Amino acid sequence: MKAIAITHAATDGSNIAYLQEIDLPTPVAKGHDLLVEVKAISVNPVDTKVREGFSADTPRVLGWDAVGVVKSVGESVTLFTPGDEVWYAGALGRAGSNSEFQLVDERIVALKPQSLDNASAAALPLTAITAWEMLFDRLGVAENGNEGDVLLIVGAAGGVGSILTQLASKLTKMTVIGTASRPESQKWVREAG
């Protein structure tokens, strides 16, 4: 299978010269793994951070947020079957989604919402998970609750901020205030809630 891997450290964080197309054997699903044919990915800040800190002797396939179709399943898989369209934020310790196929543990995968195209769905997993956990798990906000409270979101038009803005304005009774620097970002934040 074809994959894009980093071959050397990219010390300035933006240097893509060390991203190279490589050929790898197609992995085999075992245990709780799904073999997913990758259809769309997004570039996450984690990709840049891993590129900056890369120091291994062998190439590393990056990429975490992805959408794809399950091609085969390991013997312990119970949640998915071949043909399922899925989305996920992969695991740091495994080969990434910048490849034709990826092994992903079924326990960190969900069915892709049918209302989203592949590119839109691939842009959501890690940002959406982070925003949800921040609002409901870390801050302890109750769904449909917290009336009278105010939530200030700095960077409300960014990746996590944009999801957090929508979750807070649609799923809680809080007053949501968001900051954004550019006029087009300010307009988007106002329209999002």
Annotate each language-model stretch with its function.
Residues M1-K2:
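Eukaryotic N-terminal low-complexity, Ser/Thr- and Lys/Arg-rich leader segments
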